[in-house]
Curated annotation (Swiss-Prot):
Record carries keyword Transport: yes
Gene3D superfamilies: Glycogen Phosphorylase B (3.40.50.2000)
GO biological process, one term: photosynthetic electron transport in photosystem I
Organism: Arabidopsis thaliana
Protein name: Photosynthetic NDH subunit of subcomplex B 1, chloroplastic
Disruption phenotype: Malfunction of the NDH complex.
UniProt cross-references to InterPro entries, sorted A to Z: PNSB1
The organelle targeting sequence, given as a residue range: 1-44
Known function: NDH shuttles electrons from NAD(P)H:plastoquinone, via FMN and iron-sulfur (Fe-S) centers, to quinones in the photosynthetic chain and possibly in a chloroplast respiratory chain. The immediate electron acceptor for the enzyme in this species is believed to be plastoquinone. Couples the redox reaction to proton translocation, and thus conserves the redox energy in a proton gradient.
PANTHER family reported in the protein's UniProt record: PHOTOSYNTHETIC NDH SUBUNIT OF SUBCOMPLEX B 1, CHLOROPLASTIC (PTHR37698:SF1)
Recorded coiled-coil stretches: none
Cellular location(s): Plastid, Chloroplast thylakoid membrane
Composition bias, Basic and acidic residues: 75-85
Name of the gene: PNSB1
Length: 461
């Protein structure tokens, strides 16, 4: 009997009755949201409030029945206490880091969501950074005592000499798809060492930019994301996302940051919704003095000249918007427009010295020309002027920020409503649009008739 038994070892039964992966059968993924819909109605309401679908699918949001104590639960955060000044010390007082008393700082940061340091990564040039000013003011109003830092392009950094709410502005191009490895890692280390509580980004994030924000180790990582497949995986590394309406956020005009502003100003417990203030800029005394010397050398007098901005040029200092490519007008058109100026001296702003000879050829040798490349000097020039005639450049926004009469020239009515939505509410702002959709075809006669808006400035002089 024993000799008839087989000598082969007994086969071991497999752990899985069916193979864990088979190419003959399609993969099946669990849809967590369909499973969660069978729960109670109050949970489904909380799920609808959840904006980021990439986060924990089992997280139903904040518990409405949770009771907080009186400590750090309601109201806005308080500004950090300032030590008394030492009159014998030329440096004032020793500034300790904000997280020095860690046992007190961590509690309000966790319970109330305080933001002591905020970094804003801004995509674009002067125009895009200028339109972000109301958002910065909203952050300062919502989080008293917060320190706001900016990360933007070289051209965009120049804008923040007009903003006193910004502590530091660093140069880093977020739109560069292939940054230098040394620059990339150095910037990550710089941001990580500042211990930000919140990082905001206006660049449309994919997985790469989301990873950059994630490595800053900020508590709240908030960013716009692509409206297409390029956003895949970005939400895993971000705590809050805003899906852009298109791939070019600048095409939305003045309200390009509406989604982020609504989220920042949202009501929270006993704190009501924080209102969004209009665009305002502040100009330093030194910049005013430098600009005053420039336009006086050009033959202009304070309050008796009109700023002409938006001549056709290939210079980056034209301060155009990325959402409006057709926003510069040829010198032939400008020469015809200024013939309708009465009682004021037109002052042409050139973004490069090579344009000076072209302006003199088309307009005349006795033309007042000022060479300006920074938004701070442009704002100072507009502040001392009687008004502005400009295409869709930063000059239009600066004129309205300083409450100066302006005439805006746009390629279409749609562009005018997008970039200057407040024109109908203001009596000293006139928008003139081309009927053909091209800025070059704008009606010169209509522009000349609109110059009546400067008559009030002439009466004040």
């Amino acid at each position: 009997m024993a000799s008839s038994l087989p000598l082969l070892p007994k086969p071991i039964s497999p752990f899985f009755k069916t193979p864990p992966f088979s190419t003959s059968k399609p993969l099946v993924f669990l849809n967590f949201q369909t499973r969660l819909t069978s729960r109670s109605s109050d949970v489904s309401v909380n799920l609808k409030k959840k904006n980021n679908p990439w986060l924990d699918p089992f997280d139903s949001g904040e518990d409405p029945d949770n009771e907080y104590g009186s400590l750090f639960a309601d109201g806005k955060q308080d500004e950090d206490p300032r030590p008394p000044d030492n009159p014998d010390n030329p440096y004032g007082f020793l500034k300790f880091p904000k997280g020095y008393t860690v046992e007190l700082a961590s509690l309000p940061l966790k319970i109330r969501g305080d933001v002591r340091r905020c970094c804003c990564v801004i995509s674009g040039g002067v125009y895009e950074n200028l339109l972000f000013f109301p958002t910065i003011q909203l952050i300062k109003d919502r989080y008293p005592g917060v320190q706001v830092d900016i990360l933007t392009t070289e051209r965009g950094k120049q804008t923040y000499e007009l903003n006193k709410n910004v502590r530091w502005a660093n140069v880093y191009d977020p739109d560069d798809h292939w940054p230098e490895p040394a620059e990339y890692t150095d910037m990550i280390g710089l941001l990580k060492g500042r211990y930000y509580d919140m990082v905001l980004s206006t660049k449309l994030a994919g997985l790469g930019h989301a990873a950059f924000l994630f490595m800053t180790t900020a508590r709240d990582r908030v960013s716009y994301i692509y409206p297409n497949v390029n956003s895949a995986g970005a939400g895993l590394m971000l705590s809050e996302t805003f899906t852009a309406e298109n791939t070019n956020l600048s095409e939305l005009g003045y309200s390009m940051y509406t989604q982020m502003e609504d989220w920042l100003g949202r009501p929270f417990r006993s704190v009501p919704r924080t209102p969004l203030l209009p665009l305002r800029v502040s100009i330093s005394r030194k910049v005013k003095e430098v600009v005053a010397a420039k336009y006086r050398n050009a033959g202009a007098v304070t309050g008796k000249f009109i700023v002409i901005h938006g001549i056709e040029s290939d210079s980056k200092a034209s301060m155009q918007s990325k959402g409006d490519a057709d926003s510069l007008l040829s010198l032939e058109k400008w020469a015809k427009i200024i013939k309708g100026v009465r009682g004021f001296k037109p002052v042409f702003v050139i973004p490069h010295e090579k344009e000076r000879e072209n302006v003199e050829d088309f307009v005349g040798d006795d033309t007042s020309i000022v060479f300006i490349t920074t938004p701070g000097q442009l704002a100072a020039l507009i502040n001392d002027s009687a008004g502005v005639i400009a295409t869709n450049t930063a000059a239009i926004q600066l004129a309205n920020a300083r409450d100066k009469p302006c005439i805006g020239l746009f390629s279409s009515e749609e562009k005018g409503k997008l970039f200057v939505p407040y024109a109908e509410e203001k009596s000293n702002c006139v928008i003139i649009a081309s009927k053909t959709g091209k800025l070059a075809d704008i009606d010169i006669g209509t522009v000349k008739n609109a110059m009546q808006v400067f008559e009030g400035s002439l009466a004040l002089v």
